[in-house]
Regions:
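Cross-kingdom TIR/SEFIR domain
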Residues: 3-5, 15-97
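Acidic, metal-ion-coordinating active-site neighborhood of RNase H-like domains
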Residues: 7-9
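Donor nucleotide-sugar binding loop of glycosyltransferases
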Residues: 12
């Protein structure tokens, strides 16, 4: 089972990567979209890992607040009581979903 599911905008990948690396170095199994096998249905694969994860970290930026995928993944994680929101930059309340 995945410990932590990462939800973020692909535009933020390089800002999220060091966090992923640090958590992995501490022994956490981190799932992020770079692990989706070629030919696999992306939506199904992502949803399965999100639901099975112990927690989900949504990384918020000016880009990710506009991403339907990030917003949906955060909503699902919140409904399951396992959402951890991380601000990558200052945002206003009005920018959040």
């Amino acid at each position: 089972m995945t410990d932590i599911f990462f939800s973020y905008s692909s535009a933020d990948r390089e800002r999220v990567r060091p966090i992923r690396d640090a958590l992995a170095a501490q022994g956490f199994e981190v799932f992020w979209d770079q692990q989706v096998p070629a030919g696999m249905d992306w939506d199904t694969w992502i949803r399965q890992h999100l639901i099975k994860s112990k927690c989900a970290m949504a990384f918020w930026s000016a880009t990710s607040v506009s991403s339907d995928n990030v917003r949906h993944e955060a909503m699902v994680a919140k409904q399951q009581g396992k959402l951890i929101s991380v601000l990558l930059e200052p945002l206003t309340v009005e920018q959040f979903p």
